[in-house]
């Protein structure tokens, strides 16, 4: 059998992906959360796990450094590549991509400034709304931007909305629903079709069982 390399990222996605892989007979031989290693052998001799930054998972899969990856839909939209397949919605790490602004402050009708990590997605969304915006790219602490008058709105991932409210902001419009997806390198799908199809089938069954529970 051919070796499969699966790219994952630490955090919530990893925590919710590992049980799905376990159901497919793939378990890391070491505790990923406690290790500083980035490459892990598994209980399946022909499968290894690669731990990356979330934004790098699609790149590794696109260029074939990993055969398979698990990535949030937000990252995939921003990556904007057609160089891999997206065969499976894992229905994990669910959240929403939303606009938000200072609570009680009405939305401005003219040109506005928007701070976000998701520049491509935000630009597309506001263009579809027919609104003129200046996009400011930030990498974190998004909630500070409106408070410090850096922008009028932010575009960010929202789970419960508690962080927004704690910083005097309120969610406004939902841009899209987000969940984690299984992605596959196109060449790997051809060269390792049997192994990857078996993985997809096993993980899909685990996803369906989880949803039904």
Swiss-Prot record:
Pfam family for this entry, one: HisG
Catalyzed reactions: 1-(5-phospho-beta-D-ribosyl)-ATP + diphosphate = 5-phospho-alpha-D-ribose 1-diphosphate + ATP
CDD domains, A to Z: PBP2_HisGs
Swiss-Prot/TrEMBL GO biological process terms: L-histidine biosynthetic process
EC number: 2.4.2.17
GO cellular component, as recorded: cytoplasm
Main localisation: cytoplasm
Molecular function per GO: ATP binding; ATP phosphoribosyltransferase activity
Signal peptide interval: none
Annotated keywords: Amino-acid biosynthesis, ATP-binding, Cytoplasm, Glycosyltransferase, Histidine biosynthesis, Nucleotide-binding, Transferase
Subcellular location: Cytoplasm
Pathway: Amino-acid biosynthesis; L-histidine biosynthesis; L-histidine from 5-phospho-alpha-D-ribose 1-diphosphate: step 1/9
Protein function: Catalyzes the condensation of ATP and 5-phosphoribose 1-diphosphate to form N'-(5'-phosphoribosyl)-ATP (PR-ATP). Has a crucial role in the pathway because the rate of histidine biosynthesis seems to be controlled primarily by regulation of HisG enzymatic activity.
UniProt-listed PANTHER family: ATP PHOSPHORIBOSYLTRANSFERASE (PTHR21403:SF8), ATP PHOSPHORIBOSYLTRANSFERASE ATP-PRTASE (PTHR21403)
NCBIfam families in the cross-refs: hisG (TIGR00070)
Subunit and partners: Heteromultimer composed of HisG and HisZ subunits.
The family this protein is said to belong to: Belongs to the ATP phosphoribosyltransferase family. Short subfamily.
Domain comment as written in the entry: Lacks the C-terminal regulatory region which is replaced by HisZ.
Protein name (Swiss-Prot/TrEMBL): ATP phosphoribosyltransferase
Organism: Teredinibacter turnerae (strain ATCC 39867 / T7901)
